[in-house]
Regions:
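A structural signal for the principal folded core domain
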Residues: 1-234
Length: 234
């Protein structure tokens, strides 16, 4: 619902992609303030229709491309879905770093052809997959062996990699020591952020918020990494 030309960045708030990657906004935090009623109002004004969409029309359309199919507010995030989507973001960071491709785009390459650049990324994925398989016998990002579609990267696989010291296998082949250290910290902090999600234990919300902001600041310090909508929401 919230994707497409000039789309919204997050389905829980009204901030844009640029704002979600801006220091001052990150420091202030992002309140969950997007309502179903707002989305319905946009649809009533027909801003979601294809013929009415315009480039950079974020303020009026806010990413809405279809009328909502629900009549209830849904402000919760499912833990498993969060794990899988955020792991995809982490995996992209890692294989870009291994390839030495310091750009979030996978279609723009400096000094080499697009074919060579894509091949470098594919080879970097293979390096990480091989490392994980040899060290802990886990198949990462392979076709689903059960034949049900999707990939072998299940929730259990993600937890095995993020919630243990196995997470360093993802960054083992990053040659830039400083970059490797930063990405190791990012993965560690993200894993800590996820730990309380399925827990009934009480946490210090203020400290938790500080950790989330610290993580976002660390990500922003690596200039070529971009927050995806999935990662921003989670």
């Amino acid at each position: 619902m919230l994707t497409g030309l000039g789309g919204a960045f997050c389905y829980l708030c009204n901030y844009s992609k640029e704002q979600c990657n801006t220091f001052d906004y990150v420091k202030a935090g992002f309140p969950v303030d997007r309502s179903l009623e707002q989305t319905k109002q946009i649809c009533e004004e027909k801003w979601h229709l294809l013929e009415n969409r315009k480039p950079n029309d974020y303020k009026v359309r806010q990413g809405v491309t279809k009328e909502p199919i629900t009549n209830e507010e849904h402000l919760t995030l499912h833990p498993l879905h969060s794990y899988l989507r955020v792991f995809g973001w982490i995996y992209k960071i890692c294989y870009h770093a291994v390839a030495g491709h310091f750009n979030w785009s996978e279609s723009k390459f400096e000094g080499i052809s697009k074919i060579q650049g894509v091949n470098n990324l594919i080879e970097s994925k293979r390096k990480i997959q091989k490392c994980v398989e040899e060290e802990i016998n886990v198949a990462l990002e392979k076709p689903d062996p059960t034949g049900h579609g999707g990939t072998s990267t299940t929730g259990n696989v993600v937890k095995t990699l993020l919630n243990t010291n196995n997470r360093t296998l993802l960054t083992k082949h990053i040659s830039d020591v400083s970059l490797k250290e930063n990405i190791d910290k990012i993965i560690l902090y993200v894993s800590i952020i996820f730990w309380p999600v399925n827990s009934n234990s009480k946490i210090n919300v203020e400290k938790y918020s500080v950790l989330c902001q610290k993580t976002m600041m660390l990500v922003m310090s690596v200039k070529w990494i971009r927050f995806t909508p999935y990662c921003s929401c989670k």
